[in-house]
Amino acid sequence: MKRFSILVFIFAVAVTAWAVPARKTGVTVIQPDGSKITVYQHGDEHFHWQTNEKGEWIELSENGFYRLTEALSNEQIEAKRAQSIRRAQLAAYPLNVAPRGLVLLVNFADVAFATEKAEMDSMLVGENYTRTYSYTYRGKTYNINSQGSARQYFHDASNGQYNPQFDVVGPVTVSKSMSYYGKNDSYGSDMYPDKMVSEACTIADTVFNVDFTQYDNNNDGEVDFVFVIYAGYGEADGGASTTIWPHSWQLSAAGTRCEVDGKRVNLYACGNELDYYSKMHTGIGTFCHEFSHVLGLPDLYVTNTASHTTMNEWDIMDYGPYNNEGNTPPTFSAYERFFMGWLQPRLIVNPENIELKDLQESNEALLISSTDQHNLIGNNPDPTTFYLVENRQQVGWDEHLPGHGMMLTKIQYSYSRWYQNTVNNSSSKMGVDLIEASGKTDEQGKMTDLFPAGANQYLGITDHAIEAIEENDGVITFKYKGGVEDPGTAVENTQEGQEVIAIYNILGQKQATTNVEDLTAGTYIVVTPSTSHKIVR
């Protein structure tokens, strides 16, 4: 694999905006008459809506009060999402996993950064970064402890194969108010985030003398990416509808052209500075989610009104960015590492006794195919349907997962669904589906989703039984397709699958044992019913 550049099919980056999911925590809003209402956000950057505590659709009226509004069907939502997506040419996109990128801190004309640049530097690229703070929301106190910068996150997720450098510049101040760039159009999409990015780049070039040529790592004439962290709140986690929803997109898809230092700025991602609930700066969760889109990964959460469960807190591309209040996102799953080319799973075919260590420690996973064959190419798999087995433990980046144990994921890859960023919108055709060990799919993120907490076997793959699943000291063991005899017994009684009937030394003297393990150092002839061969101990 090339050190910095791999070829993947990156669909939504080339054709649409990808976004972080709405935060599930409701926001208490005080209305003009002093009454309170709890508002819940749903959807994503393409189309989003709000509900009250009863699940009824609501909207903010011109008089400042929330009122009931007509709920839309899944079909209507999908139609609106499709209309809001500006489509570019569909093609295989050569993704440059850039070793260096630009992060711009951006003030609006009416909202300025509250966080020191030095803190943003440490959070994104610092060595041994730690963060400790507390806050109270709705009478509950949250005590947050986290460690690890965004750079460390991607270093660890890639098993040391990717070490991005994020150069933090700013703050720069754009000319318009937050509401100008962030207000929603009739489809629920932000109006002018592209103009914010373009203007910020131009100002950074002029005021901070940023040399944009150093961010074209593959020298193709285009800056590999720009990440904007904008002042204030974001719409996905409680901010007003006039704030910007964190997302990844292309300026060209919005009809905006930006050129600085002879380089074209196109691919960008953005996220908010402050967390609505703690009123402090956000953790690295949203940054890591959006930057993962830059790398080419799609969203795994449901983007219509369907209520089926997805990967939720188990995955960075679902609700995982909010783990530990947005400070400790889960590491890349085996699938995400496979897709990026940072892990090659082992295809298991024959009966075997399996031992599997924690993914973060080993960077190992297993692949099961119903045909017992696979090309082992993560971003262009053949067959397109397969299973991945990995061991997830509540340590490091996975400390705040709902549980620990063996994770079994079913992949049903579809070019069109990856392209449309609707990977898991259909409950009958999930693209990346967590196989819940307990069989209960009506709850979000629970300990019994994994084996053996939820069950000690899985027989759902015809002729590919996974049985006797155990977990000891963080290590998973199980029998695949019935397993094999105990290794000790097999060595004692067989050689190359056949029973040992006699053993001779090189002088032709028959040994008193047929157990190879009992032999002292030397050269021997091992006899089985059909053959004999020499071994050296």
Predicted regions and their residues:
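Non-catalytic C-terminal accessory/binding modules of secreted extracellular proteins
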Residues: Q31, A114-T115, S122, R131-D156, ...
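N-terminal prosegments of processed precursors
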Residues: W18-L95, K357
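Positively charged n-region of N-terminal signal peptides that target proteins for export
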Residues: M1-I6, R537
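Sec-dependent N-terminal signal peptides
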Residues: F4-A14
